[in-house]
Regions:
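Catalytic-core signal marking the mid-to-C-terminal active-site face
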Residues: 124, 135-156
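Secondary-shell segments that build the walls of catalytic and ion/ligand-binding clefts
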Residues: 69-134
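Generic structural signal for well-ordered, non-membrane alpha-helical segments
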Residues: 30, 114-118, 156
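Phosphate/diphosphate-binding glycine-rich loops and adjacent basic-rich segments that engage nucleotide
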Residues: 20-94
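Glycine-rich phosphate/pyrophosphate-binding loops
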Residues: 7-19, 122-140
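A glycine- and small-aliphatic-rich helix-loop capping segment at beta-alpha/alpha-beta transitions
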Residues: 1-10, 26-33
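Structural beta-strand/beta-sheet cores of well-ordered domains, especially the beta-sheet scaffolds
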Residues: 8, 33-35, 45-47, 72-73, ...
Length: 156
């Protein structure tokens, strides 16, 4: 949102970790890979968007686990990678070194491949352009970032 102070469009992405299971995958290969964008407007409040590419943000999942909330359908995958579409249980699939979160959409039929594709794209932008070399070389604790700001009047 710092770009808004200068009447600029700001974008930020983060990649890394291994919490997201690819569509039809059996192992977590990507992080939640969130994106944030802020766009100034002339007379109205700015457009600000921030979202993970998984069905639920990692920090929100941790918070809900601490307060004893139940899993919702489509948040996580079973150990074999199949989406858990029943929900209602504890966070058993979300614990341990591999959280097995699903891409937004949960299943191929509901469009999970689209958010998985976005997550890979964000990983490329973050990892490759920052010399982080992408998810193949980042261990679970490392992150790579992409940050940009565009002058709106530069496109007029």
């Amino acid at each position: 949102m710092m770009a808004l102070e200068y009447d600029m469009v700001g974008t930020c992405m983060t990649a890394g970790g291994n919490t997201m299971v690819p569509t039809f995958g059996a192992e977590a290969k990507l992080g939640t890979n969130p994106i944030a964008i802020a766009v100034p407007t002339l007379n109205k409040p700015p457009f600000v968007f921030d979202a993970a590419t998984t069905t639920i943000a990692g920090n929100k999942m941790g918070l809900l686990e601490r307060i004893g909330a139940e899993m919702q359908p489509g948040w996580v995958a079973h150990d074999d990678g199949t989406p858990d579409m029943n929900g209602g249980g504890e966070f058993q699939y979300a614990k341990g070194p591999q959280r097995m979160q699903l891409p937004l959409g949960s299943t191929r039929e509901l469009g999970s491949h689209k958010c998985y594709g976005l997550a890979v794209s964000f990983d490329i932008m973050c990892g490759m352009l920052s010399n982080g070399f992408g998810f193949k070389t980042l261990d679970a604790s490392r992150r790579a970032h992409y940050v940009s700001a565009f002058r709106v009047d530069g496109f007029a």
